[in-house]
Amino acid sequence: NKNRCQIVGNRGNALIYSLSGWSFTRTSSKVIDDMDWGGVLRLNNSDLLESADGVLSFDGSGHTVTINGFPNNNITISNRADFARAALIMQHDSNVFVKYSGASRADMLAANISLSADVDISDTGLTGFMRDNGEDTFTGTLTGNSHKLTMTVGTENDKIVFHTHNGLFAKTSGAKISDLTIVSNFNIVGDNVSGGDACYIGSVSAYNSGALTIDKVTADVTASPSGAYTNFVGGLVGYVADATSEVSFTNSAVTANLTYNNSTTKVDCTCLGGVIGMVGAVTSKPAPVIKFDNVTVGGKITDKHTGSNSRVGGLIAEVGAKDNSASVVPNKVSI
């Protein structure tokens, strides 16, 4: 009802949102989320509205939601309502329950996004643009126009539990991110079972395959993963997968404060890197080139993992080796 929340859709494609005065207190006995991606979107009575010209509108007779869509995939984001609209479309197919017109989900995953103002999505329930279980890949562009994007993921009673891909973009391939300041804080509870799902965390991209261009990006990143299984955490990118295309970081600065406090862990691994958590083993030719040009990295990395698989690096925590060797080319790097 008007004082609580709506659940619209079906398993795997549901939208859950609250209107105002909503909160959730997680019990100490709960160790896993029932949903494996997303969170509860928190609308309000000011800038995140349930209305035809707001984020979305609700039809009580059919129990359906219409998201305020975009005419095409050239997107300008001027406030957090615009961000929410774009994120909802990236995460939901248009169907009988959740509808929108204009740019499709596929269009949005290849969008050209531009910021026209600073945007803070903290306390909205949004965990980034995309689903954080890594089903889809962003292939478009994001131009910050010197604006700042702030996000906080996993507050005390809104922790992200067992969600695998955590970042502004869950997965990227061929994406270009430029002229952006990003401030992000991740409090993520990863998988606690050996052999379970790895947890990927990166302020820009949790997991990248293929090319990636990051230019003129300033990132202030705090991340505190706590799962006992594998954690790949990077100031900008959590994991770079096997690829044959260049991944470049230019004219950028990262302050990465990364902490792993689970001192009881002796198996599996952690990779905490100032820019990249891990570059995966290369199985194809030509081997990828990871290029750093005019990059400054600062902050503090603390890893209390007590096993032999603890990896820490100022730029990259680990570069995997298999059939070929990835080339890491640093130029004008300060750590």
State where each predicted segment sits.
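Surface-exposed repetitive/solenoidal architectures
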Residues: N1-I335
